[in-house]
Amino acid sequence: SDLQSNKKSIEPKVIKSNFSPYKTLDTFFYKNKIFVSYSNKKENCYNFNIDYAEFNLNELNFNNFYQSTECSIQNYYQPHGGKMQYYSNNQEDGLLFTIGDNNDIPKPDDSIVGKILFIDFQNQNEVIFSQGHRNTQGLFSNDEIVLSTEHGPRGGDEINKISYNKDYGWPFASYGEPYGSKIYHPLNKFYEKPKYLKNHSKKNFSEPIFAFAKSIGISEIIKIPNNFSNFWNNNFLLSSLWEQSLFRIQFGDNYNKIMFYEKIFIGQRIRDIKYHNELNGIILALEEKGQLGIITTKKID
């Protein structure tokens, strides 16, 4: 059925800043600081960056927090993902963040492409946390678990339970199907595209918790507080682009499987979702019309 909601206009506020990226990927708030991940275009390549600023509604003065030394060749690859979450790694506080890899060519183990990385706040030291990721669009972290969502090729969108130093298979294993039969390499060569392994574990890759056979255009994943609804206890929400829907999810013990999911049709591509404490509601970033949607169990004045 159609969602019923009260309309509330939100007047946008323009905040002055010294921030001028080529492509913004994600924003994240931590202890009155705003972190922004983005890609920058160099002379003939793209690199990945994170800047931060003390949050101020009048003006934001950004400083660089992280800049990749690796630069991806123009017209071959641009950084994707860029999702960020707080994480404590060996008692060091920092950020987990994702750098996607839409290309089928295997990357060196020391490349940041197709990885989830950790960088600590104090020294900005970079650690590869996990690898074998295609295009990680959603990231969730708390004291109990790290979860990610990942676009597959022509199907095979994944929900993954992330563990340190594990390999999740891309570009060798996927439940999706190849686009075309050739791989383009930046040295102007073409290679036959191999078929993807469907059983990740045969080659010691980590299996996803769940994979959608048909692509939903998977995006963000969040946990819903139990006070949102008595009927949604210990539930997660997953957003989607292609399906224009939310998916309410219940995981099993130890997050090794999904017990059930419920599809909730919204009718627009949902790029991002966040829970808002004061509203006790879920805010949706609706892509096609540039709108914000709110789902709440109480009346909005």
Could you say what each language-model-derived stretch is?
Residues 14-20, 66-76, 127-132, 211-213, ...:
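Surface loop/turn motifs at the tips and blade-to-blade linkers of beta-strand repeat domains
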Residues 22, 44-88:
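Asp-box/WD-like beta-propeller blade repeats and closely related beta-sheet repeat scaffolds
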